[in-house]
Each structure stands twice: as structure tokens, then as C-alpha cells.
Amino acid sequence: MNKRFRCVIAGWLLLMLCACTGGTDEPHIRYYRLASGQSENYLANQACQRFCDMVRRETDGAIQILPSFDNELGTDASALEQCVYGGIDFVRTPISSAAAYAPQLAALQLPYEYTSDKHLFRVLDGAVGQQVMASLEDKGLTGLSYFYAGYRCVFTTGKASTSLEAMKDLRLGTEDSSQMKQVIPMWGAEAVTLPPDEIALALRTDRIDGAESTLPTYVDSGYYQLAPYWTYDRHSYNADVLVASSETWETFSQEEQTIIERCAAEAASWQRDHWQSAEVRAMLHASRSGCYMALLDEEQAEKFRAAVQPIYEHLSDAQKEVVQAVQALADSD
């Protein structure tokens, strides 16, 4: 074998080695799935997209998280179940759904539990929120961040509901939430369970006298045109959780986990700021459109709170401890 032929063979072997290893500069790309309800335009889903984009950038394209919206991968309950077993890698879901795996989470979503959004944020961002989120780990889920889902209030067609007396016998539409189906009768009203896409028709046909929702949904869904009386009772402040399958989580290096946690926190902060801005815009639009935006006086607010106390009495000891910790962080003014 002459010298030139040996050089050709050596060069060919070197090329084959590079082809097999993919070179040292090309990252090994791994793909993951993220499931979420609502449309891609929903603010929490915009935050999910930002989260996926940031993770891709921060890992130089090595980790590619592909989001699916509109419950494409299943309902919240189904997506969480798949996430537990590693069938779906990440899920954004309401706390109420995740509470099926960690009952302490339900203690963060009780009626009239928070005095303001700042109170909620102190809880979610502090030790209480992190400890409660950590309770998911025993069930195969790793909590990453909380997304703010706004406060919910009552809106009605005929008059403002600024007292329990005004609530009596009203038919109020609500989603299939066991808590709201409990709360509304405690106000003296009737709970009418409806999917979100039937609320507007039910208002038009007088099947219901009102409903409860967030301000952005009140405006974006056109409810403000059908039920122009909005009462700031703020019966609940809501949050979603972004979780990862613990099975998937354990495949990431420590550095990758740190990157993912940082991106989740940044996405949550972005979403919170934009949701609060959306609430202000919705309030201005509704009021300028002629809606009556009513406040509860302190006497009536206390009556509303007292009416739902039986819900607190039926909590487990662990949930009551969470509630006490939440109350300790309430606004002082």
C-alpha cells in the first residue's frame, strides 16, 4: 500500500468518524411536549410560548419544547395524568385541576381568601407557595412556576349585586367548578353550570341573570354588552401552575434544570405584568361603554365573606395550616 493510498484511507476514516459523532459543535436536539388549554392567543399560552422559546435559546437549541394548545393533547385532567407517567413533559393547568394530585393547592384558591393581588403574589412567590407546589413531587410532578389568572367577580343583567339581598334567587352561570357550585347557593343565588361558550347565549335568552368571570374575559367575550352590571366582589384570585413530569425532569442535567426554572420564572413574570395591564384596559373599556362598575362597601363585603365560611370549616388540617399561613401575609392597610 503506497503512501498516497494510506492518506486517502485515513482521511476517509476521519470523515466517517465525524459523520457518526455528528461533530463536536452540533448539539444533540431533544424534543418535548407541553400541553395547555385555551387558544394560542390566551395570555397564559403566550407566556408558555415565551417559555419554550427562551429554553430553546438558553440551551442553544438542544432542548426544544413544542407547545400544544386548545386541549389538543387532552383535557386538563387527562394531560396531568399523562404528565405523571411521562407521556407529556410539561403542562400548564389551573390550580384547581392540579389540586387533584396535591390537595394543599386547593387551599390557595378559596373564596375571599386574598385581600389584593399583591397579597396573592406574596403567597405564591414566597415560602408558602413554594412549599405547597413542592407537594406535587410525591405524585410525579415537578412544579416550575405560577401564572396569574386574575380575580373573578359577578356581573348581572338587571342591577348591581352589591348586597347578599340583591343576590337572592339570581340565576348565575358558572363553569363546572365544585367550589363555585358551593359558593353561589351560599349567596342565596342559583348556580347554573354552563360551558364558557354557552354563557353569552344563556344571557341573551334570559336563561341566567348573570355569571362570574375575570375582567378580560368579561370584555373579550362580549358579556359586558349583555350584562352591564359588574360588581367588584373579587370572590377569588386565581392562578395556574406550570409543571413538568418528574420522569422527564430527572433526565435533565443540573444546569439544564436551572435554565428551565429561570425561563419558567421569567415567563410567569411577563405573564403577570401583561395580565394586570389587560385588567386595566378591560375596566376602562367596560366603564367607557356604559357599564356600571360597583364596589362592595365593607359591611356587605364582610357579609359575603361570612356566607362562605362553611367551606373553610370542611378543610383538612393540612389545608387549614396553609390558610393560616396565607392569612398571615394579608395586607396590613
What function would you assign to each model-found segment?
Residues 20-118, 128, 137-333:
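N-terminal secretory/targeting leader peptides
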Residues 122-134:
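Signature of the catalytic double-stranded beta-helix
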Residues 8-19:
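Bacterial N-terminal signal peptides
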Residues 1-9:
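Bacterial N-terminal signal peptides that target proteins for export
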